[in-house]
């Protein structure tokens, strides 16, 4: 290569260097490689030619350049037809190749192009790129043309042009620019609004004069075209802001206007039509419609990626049935999020029908990993949607220290120590106190009818309220009592009075210390019987339990709770050895015969009167 370049004149070597620089970014060009691949060939450019053709080939990296490089004799025709297109510094449509300086220095750039001072004709190779936006503050449509990275706007109503941005395209200094604009007689200063609309607006004619004076009219094409609205087309080339042009303006196609310059300049525009789609003009139509489709195409929700396990699939829109099998493996998801995701998915063929999706969701509830925990087996009544949809089997409920109520009232297995210590002595008290005939027959049906609907909730109450002070206190106070003292086969350890040995009424108190309250009635014994009594000293609080119509129960209940002194005596007498069982029974029976000093008019049936909770707080308080 050195031997080939040695005997050649300086200009020829220089042309080789310039072509080597420009063709570095176009490896597909064959015109520049002919020197090095075929040494016997003559040089591409004659020594007498200027630098323009060498730089003009860099603009058109297509097979045409090979043909023109072989036809060496008429280089001047290529100069006249192609150099002016290359000399126009259009940063958007041309490759960033630093070859313009050579063409400008040669003195030949303006030979084939007649400068249009009116701005109506398109420069060679320039495509009309105009966008429009609605200037809401002024209530006018603005046409925008970008040149050298500056957006110059023109108003539709009065044709005024932003002179500040116009002179910025010319590269004028700030002081000179402001001085020129201040001397304008007709001007409109805009200080509030978008950045490209701020500045000093001058009339159309003055703006055209400034553009011609600064030689930037061709750069600003088609800003000065009279009917610029005809150049508006679908905003595929707009990447700065959303278009607000009416649909009628968007549909006005550019075909008749854009193709007229191509008929005038067929050689140069032919190359430009091949070259300009590469840098930026065609990249914008490719990107813009994809954004529009992204807004409308059914996309899975954000949390559906973790819900479904999309990573194992080829396409995120392929909702195959295998996704349902992966749903139960995602641990932290709850049922609500999955159902809301199913609702957010559009009902198009790209998604699974809701029936199949919900069947996959049902696998949460019967899982042993959830149902074996007390937190998920039964929920409070305020959240019924989380409760299990099938009643849990009795075997699984034995873990919580509660036995599920069955049809027979006597076969409940002994519960755990804590709950057993709360409830064992109650059955003995009730069986001996209310052993008179008809009470034992009618009372279980009442309790079953009242307490059975709550069994789904009461089973889980122990897990929510295990830290209840009343239950804990009673469990420790009376844990020393044995079944021998109470004589009860089922319940142990507490002297609190409950309805009989049936298992439905004791479901109230171990964890659910606030049963439904009937209407209030005043009672002297509210201090003892009400768990929510605010003061233990005065009996002015209302008895929320004693409003039923059976006086037989109320006398027994209230009489047994006669006074605080009576309660202290009972507690002292409870801790007795097993051999004094007879004396203890006679004391407990004696309370039945004592007439209370003014009990309520009507008592509550035993199934509705949770006296166990009342005794729990008092004995725990002492």
From Swiss-Prot:
A Pfam cross-reference name: KilA-N
Keywords: Conidiation, DNA-binding, Nucleus, Sporulation, Transcription, Transcription regulation
One GO CC annotation: nucleus
Record feature DNA-binding region, as residue ranges: 163-184
Cross-referenced Gene3D superfamilies: Transcription regulator HTH, APSES-type DNA-binding domain
Renumbered residue ranges of the record's region Disordered: 1-24, 62-81, 239-517, 549-622
Listed GO MF terms: DNA-binding transcription factor activity; sequence-specific DNA binding
Domain HTH APSES-type stretches: 129-235
Loss of function: phenotype: Leads to defective conidiophore morphology and impairs conidia production. Affects cell wall beta-1,3-glucan biosynthesis.
Keyword Transcription set for record: yes
Localization per Swiss-Prot or TrEMBL: Nucleus
Swiss-Prot/TrEMBL induction comment: Expression is increased 50-fold during the establishment of developmental competence. Expression is positively controlled by brlA. Expression is also regulated by the LAMMER kinase lkhA.
Compositionally biased spans, kind Low complexity: 384-395
InterPro entries for this protein: EFG1/Phd1/StuA (IPR029790), HTH_APSES_sf (IPR036887), KilA/APSES_HTH (IPR018004), Tscrpt_reg_HTH_APSES-type (IPR003163)
Summary of the function given for this chain in its UniProt record: Transcription factor that regulates asexual reproduction. Binds the StuA-response elements (StRE) with the consensus sequence 5'-(A/T)CGCG(T/A)N(A/C)-3' at the promoters of target genes. Required from the very earliest events of asexual reproduction until completion of conidiophore development, but is not specifically required for differentiation of conidia. Represses transcription of the abaA developmental regulatory gene and of the developmentally regulated awh11 gene. Controls the expression of the catalase-peroxidase gene cpeA.
Designated name of the protein: Cell pattern formation-associated protein stuA
Organism: Emericella nidulans (strain FGSC A4 / ATCC 38163 / CBS 112.46 / NRRL 194 / M139)
Gene symbol of the encoding locus: stuA
